[in-house]
Amino acid sequence: MNISTDEMYNSHSRFIHKKFIIHFSASETLEVTKSDYLVQSSILEESFKLSDSPFGEVTSNELALTLFNEDGLFNPANNKGKYYGLIKKGIKIEAFIKVDEVNDWDRFGVFYVTNWVANSGGISASVTAYDILYNVINGSVPSFPVYRNVNFNEFMKDYFEYFNITDIEVDASINWIIPYAYTSVYSSNKEFLSDLMIGALADCFCNHDGKIVIKSKSSNRDLRATLTDDDQIISMSIKQTIDTDYDSVNVTCNVGQESSEQALLSISDMSVSIGNNASGKLVLNSQPALSIKSIKTEGNNAVTVRSFNASANEFECILRSTTVTNTSLDVFGTVLEIVSSNIGKLGDAPLNIDSKYIQDLSKANEILKYAEDYVKASVPTLEVTVRGNPNLQLGDKIVIESDFYKISYTGIIVKAEYKYIGNLSSVLTLIDASALKEV
């Protein structure tokens, strides 16, 4: 037997092994296990940041390691240590887990170091790392042109390719043509992705293979597993239902339209020399730009535009001049204008949903129905402490069947925290599957 099965992870006689491969460089790796340096570890996974709304911020999974710092081996300042100069941010760490009776390891996430602390003379080193989404969330927002009537899947491929990520998995049930797709008005990638996932009715997270997954909130899911008192359940708690917070839903629909021609950029005095002059990237005054209609230059001598390139928020060009002079540069074009309206009922405590990616009434009504069903479902969020089954992933549908707690609950895993201190335990957070109105 080479695969760790659910039955093996459920067994009361199980013995679990965990290992981490730390890639200090292309040629220098270290395998960390219970018998070699590993003191304890924890992994926190979330499909979205839980809040009092069915939608939440996109987040990244976290790994925390405590290593036995023998002879200062893992002290970044120890210039006599084997890994001196190699301990830095961005180090790749692969996590694996298995039961004793099998040979093959199950993947349990891919992470990249953000913090490594080992006090001088201390006996342990603390390492914090996050999955690849952390780099996306904390990276610069791409400067794309506005995409018109683009397929969601294609837009996501282009977006993640900007971060050199080509292997993503998009739920095939998300068949969405976005009227206007753009990034330029967002201050961060977390803000952009969280806003986009509202429109997509989806969650964005990393699975145990380290792959970015975009999964529909409302697509049909097969039952993955049943957890019972006999095999997994240790304890549980039930959070109040969302309907106690809200009595209605209000959705803002942000319909885009192309503006009339207007000035996008105006520079009154630009120095140019003989030959070709690169303007560098210039920030447009009006955003997001849809099209460039005309470019004008003026000066004492003829200055011509050889070429230009524009995104939704930036413009750059090559100006050709026959002499050293000053010129003005005026760029004219159209921008995306937004006309907003609200649908739904305004009660005393409405759940307000507003996303730039709710761009037509059809999408607004789809989200309104989803949110109203969720609010009206009167279903709890369940937090259950279990012995832990690493075969389960975020987004899996499972049944919690407990005679002791007198509950039968079918839920979707939206958060999982695994702790390993010689053995494995886990806390799963589930939202009721009936509230998702699967199709």
Name every feature range the model reports, one short phrase each.
Residues M1-V146, D158, Y162, A181-S184, ...:
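Assembly/oligomerization scaffold segments
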Residues N2, D36-E45, I137-V150, Y186-G199, ...:
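Surface-exposed, non-catalytic interaction/assembly patches
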Residues S41-T66, V251, L346-V379:
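Short beta-strand/loop turn elements enriched in aromatics
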Residues N61, G109, I123-A125, G210, ...:
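Envelope-exposed proteins and targeting segments
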Residues F68, I132, R148-D171, Y357-L361:
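Glycine-rich, acidic and aromatic/proline-enriched surface loops and short helix-turn segments
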Residues N119, N164-S173, I198-V213, T304:
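Short, well-structured beta-strand/strand-turn elements
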